[in-house]
């Protein structure tokens, strides 16, 4: 201990001297050197202090050594290598931390208001004493005193937990699973982000109660982002500027010695005896020594509130009762969890005070269930490993709690706890678990030493023995207590006989006959009789898995069964400890039970084993031989196969063949042959088939084999609707009159929706309209209104009363979970005890509910079930009555429901009551379903000598709706006419009727003559009956009236009037107006404000229709393109969603359908179906994209809503699909697909050829690992890291997803790495594809600009490509892009550029570019002929100038600004903040117009703010003469502005330019008017468009080259200082309606306005601008005047959306004219010069129709924007101060300032003089505006 202390002090003294130098080097080398990686925190034994914390997880060696130490002497001598390593940052910061804790204000740390629970964490004195008792918590002390044992504490808590406020469940799982490992306090810094990591640390240290998840925050950020995406609308108090960060130095290692535990969960609370807390309250301590709280008397002594705490890193068995005091004394972490628990308890108490006793009872039952579960978690289910401190097991990931003295041979066992997954295992002392769970230890040892383990040498596998029948049940089956029934023994004999004959078979007994037991008996027979010890693989659905496990324990306890399920860590644990004997490498288990899903996930592992037996439960999932599950399983190596299914045939003969082909592929090889032999065309087909099937299929039904099984009687109880139901029913029909009137022209889905609404109405009114929450006087009133709202409930109420008296037990089934809620409420009020099971009730709780109901002497009267819940494996034979509250579309589901009660073991007659509402759709559905189900549903018939077998070739309808449109129309009309005959408001209540009378009149069906779709039903029909039934049904179809005859006209009109009123209300709802502007956001995730707005909008519309969420959809004409539901038949919406998600993970997805099916868990779908869906998605997206682009040609109004941002969307069935994201992902992974060789051998040798940068992971990582990672992505899909890790061929098991969650690479790092590698791949492929064409293009494009070459070094590759990733690039060149010199790129180059753009999608933020690009491409293609005539002066822009670049090791230089997103680092942000301070008010108001302004006023407000801001930016840019600086700072300042609004920088800049342009135009108009009134117009040659482009976009030239003469309007700001073509990394989100599209259309056609064709800041033109100046120094005059105007007016045209007026709309004219104006031709004289003088007025006519003669007249922002004339000079109270004062920011580079800064902004000289000066001087003065 002392040595350790000395060491710390020594370090402390030496550290201060060299801290600064070390910090510098560490910041750079930290990631790769490991000097400050997580290894310091204990994951490496040699890392100094890491080893002091007794980690059990580093390796079992270090673990066992550490275990042997006593708590008093925890630290070990520091290893010498620790001294050599540079000390970690942690070792340099303890002193400062202490200061920081004590004097937070000194360091500017904002203290959270929450109380700090553990100030002592930085208490050097206490921590210096390392492991001494003074530092250990009280609870540990108590434990040590009580048990005289040293408890090993869990080091993961030493420094990891800074509180655990709201730990995510997933993290809990992982955290619990690998307790000692995750040390996340000091994540490994990422090289580029040092300051940010620091801030992360600071923030974490500020709050003791933060979740330990937070510690991962920095780790989660991908390297891609240079800075956080923050909104700067208001400064966050919690944020710290980079200036505030301090370098922290000081003694390290202290944190590691903090012994405090961490709360993982608070399980319960109680009032207990004071001081009765801590170790003495654990379950085992109480059992040994009694409960310290036993003698506590609440009346005599004062108690304290105590909480049952589950500790992090300890299993549930170690949970202790603690009071708040005891927790605070121990300085535990995670007290936030306790706060949350207390808060929740208070809420529950308040709630319990308000609700009825029944609710209280229900709540306490729930609590009891939960505490039962917690108790279960304290039971050891299985011991899976053992270790002693001497014999270790290698790396171990589980918590260990050794309390043993120095070296000892006492073993510890790794325990799997009941009800918890394998990932929750923990090491426990033998002394502890031996007391209660000795049997688990014994069975572990017997398993370990067992000789009955699988061997390939088993004789029976090679040569099957002769069959000997079992005359009676063998002793090894079920012992003495369990007996097989006769037919089960017969089944066992049949299975054994088939095995001896080498026939794989299908066991197809009816549900409830014990197929599970027969299968287990058969395996036990192989095990005992033939010494075949496995391995047996049994694949089962999740719902039956526990019953399989349970039956194995009962019937065959000698067989070692492993249940292989759970998350990755659980499965890894199973493979590590339960799989093979480490010495012999032979399998440990005999049988493995797993689910279909896990089988597919781990098919590589499971498929590598030779199975002696393969059994598939619910094998009808294999009916589709084209499905992935089928294809995967059929490839498994197995010696014998058994399919277990109660329903071997559904729909068609082919399904039966699929099953037969699976078990005996040699015998049933081809479907065509099978069909030919046994097709229905042959008269004796079925008899011959019967003979063929006999050896392979065994089918018994209950009534044949179990004579003792009582009868099943079904009664249909028809009930009247209540008056309220009738009203609702009529209202639904009337409201949907239009849809109904369409008849067969209507949509099936529309009809189905109406039928569903009506079915809901038949069940209960509350399903249509929930009751108002009135203050309920009594439970009785609630009960009455509940019952009166449904005719069925009136009847059920009477029925249940009768059944309760008779002592029956009832199952109530409903399809609708909300109906179950209503029934649960009813049962609660009636005080009937019940259980409930629906899809939301999971796993253990479900099992408990079933056990509770089936238990002997159970009080439960009812069991509520959803018809589809729980699969077929639920046994509720203790019930004798089934109530089917509402029938399913598919009667088969109802039959399964009945069978849950009517099963073997049932001793009473089973009564089934089916409730049907008279005269409604429900009654008609049941009648029709009865007729149809023979053909459409489950049709297998028992195999008997009669040969009556129903085998239809038609596939039947497998979807949930068995009816077509005609039938649905008829169903809807059924009963409606009679209903409408009752006068509205006078609907009759159902007649009171005695329950006995109802039952007497009910239609009764005995099971023998049942017409339900059971096997019994079919045996009553001869095959010949089928065709006639179909005909009869058609003949019986009765004539129906039309809907207009059924629904009275006055009711229809009434509804129409209501709808009209609603529409009018919606039209006048103002909030809708701003929706479009507000929707445009910088990134795709909706902000809070956005969601609030949407909420407001949706509340504005009360519409209940499908369109209610239209606002969230892209604003386009009409609704999203929809793909009809019948085109995706066989897929539910959920399945389609899963398919689409998986579709986006693979390259060329249509060729990878099997992988997609596996990923989407659609393995039982056929490949043909999957292909159909895949092609449907692909084709729909492609055509939607084309349509979208066409639409954009015609109109830009779509640019307003999110459609602009997200591109078009389509609907596949009910699933909305973002077209752009699909196409983007297809393109993204295409490169990978192309680069990976097809040949398997070549694929194994695949290696990346390009140079890659180092990965900086915590494992050795080279280019081979990168290559394997890409192969993994190719094989398993992007993001499926678990599968990649477990694939043995990839050899990445030990490299990725390390167990320690703070070690890299985890998922986030892998994702970043893969994105980077894909980028490199794309670059490599592009280079290959474009060499020749690139050279050619280069030669062509160089010619025009030989005169002037940019000085900056050229950093592009030889094809003119930016080195930046195309996915990041700001300027993805598009296919067919027309350059300004008129040369179109060569086709190859086009293709390559297109690829570049395609791939340009790494971040969702930047992914919007691409559609822009597509539009540009279309436009430019259309117009390329016209453009080709352009002059060489407008030379090629394919090469952009190079400014400052990032030089990154291992990759090419990236120009700054090209590869960065819209974010600023802290320093830049501060500079921008200072510079924009003068317009602070405008910034704040930009997004917050005053309430109550009209749309027009809002527009003006925003425009004014933008003009002020833009002018200010222009002013700031005058400080620079260097082009690159201007470009950079323009970008930065606009990005800064974008933080105040939801638009991105590019959009704002564009809007500003439009507003500016408009202002200039209006000033020009005004000037012309003034001129025409007051004198001759001076000569002003107008610049050609090209010159104007160059001029305006070149910021090193003045943005206002000509001074204003006194009589000219003053120029305001930078005269559109960014060219309209300025490129931004995101496409501009335009927000203009049709009315505004003119100018923009033209811009798009010529790659002009705001498109993607130029880099940010207008550098498209800088290569040739000086050349231009030479000849055209006058050229900009007229043009600039056109933009110089200070006055602008609101347009009188009514607009819907705020930003429309920014668009400069001109009349459409010939393209040549337009081109002339914008593309300079030095040889031609401008046609504009010959145009009439009023041409411009005409030109901009659409912008504004009425222009006042003078100035602005107060309509605009302020006086600042008036026209400036000499006579008005006095109004300018003072000129703007010189730029030196305006930009006094110390950080702005003085060297960049213009030499003319000091000149007066209103320096008036003659235009000639001024222009001559311009010509000679490149640094022009900008005219400064007053803002």
Curated annotation (Swiss-Prot):
Keyword Manganese appears in the UniProt entry: no
UniProt binding sites for ATP: 509-516
Keywords in alphabetical order: ATP-binding, Chromatin regulator, DNA-binding, Hydrolase, Myogenesis, Nucleotide-binding, Nucleus, Phosphoprotein, Repeat, Transcription, Transcription regulation
InterPro entries for this protein: CDH1_2_SANT_HL1 (IPR040793), CHD1-2/Hrp3_HTH (IPR056302), CHD1-like_C (IPR025260), Chromo-like_dom_sf (IPR016197), Chromo/chromo_shadow_dom (IPR000953), Chromo_domain (IPR023780), Chromodomain_CS (IPR023779), Helicase_ATP-bd (IPR014001)
Chain positions with Phosphothreonine modification: 240
Subunit details: Interacts with MYOD1. Interacts with histone H3.3.
GO BP terms in the entry: chromatin organization; DNA damage response; gene expression; hematopoietic stem cell differentiation; muscle organ development
Bias kind Basic residues: ranges: 175-204
Subcellular location: Nucleus
Protein name: Chromodomain-helicase-DNA-binding protein 2
Taxonomic superkingdom: Eukaryota
Residues that bear Phosphoserine: 207-208, 242, 1085, 1087, 1365, 1386, 1806
Source taxonomy: Eukaryota, Metazoa, Chordata, Craniata, Vertebrata
Source organism (scientific name): Mus musculus
Feature: compositional bias, Polar residues: 1584-1601
Predominant place of localization: nucleus
Cited function: ATP-dependent chromatin-remodeling factor that specifically binds to the promoter of target genes, leading to chromatin remodeling, possibly by promoting deposition of histone H3.3. Involved in myogenesis via interaction with MYOD1: binds to myogenic gene regulatory sequences and mediates incorporation of histone H3.3 prior to the onset of myogenic gene expression, promoting their expression.
PANTHER family: CHROMODOMAIN-HELICASE-DNA-BINDING PROTEIN 2 (PTHR45623:SF19), CHROMODOMAIN-HELICASE-DNA-BINDING PROTEIN 3-RELATED-RELATED (PTHR45623)
Phenotype seen when the gene is deleted: Growth delay late in embryogenesis and perinatal lethality. Heterozygous mice show decreased neonatal viability. Heterozygous mice display glomerulopathy, proteinuria and impaired kidney function. Glomerulopathy may be associated with anemia. Heterozygous mutant also show increased extramedullary hematopoiesis and susceptibility to lymphomas, with defects in hematopoietic stem cell differentiation.
Domain comment, as recorded: The CHD1 helical C-terminal domain (CHCT) may bind DNA and nucleosomes.
Region (Disordered): 1-264, 1030-1124, 1329-1465, 1556-1638, 1679-1827
Residue spans of biased composition, Acidic residues class: 234-258
Annotated Basic and acidic residues bias: 1-14, 81-101, 115-128, 146-155, 1037-1065, 1347-1371, 1396-1431, 1565-1574, 1697-1719, 1738-1748, 1759-1771, 1794-1813
Region span, CHD1 helical C-terminal domain (CHCT): 1464-1566
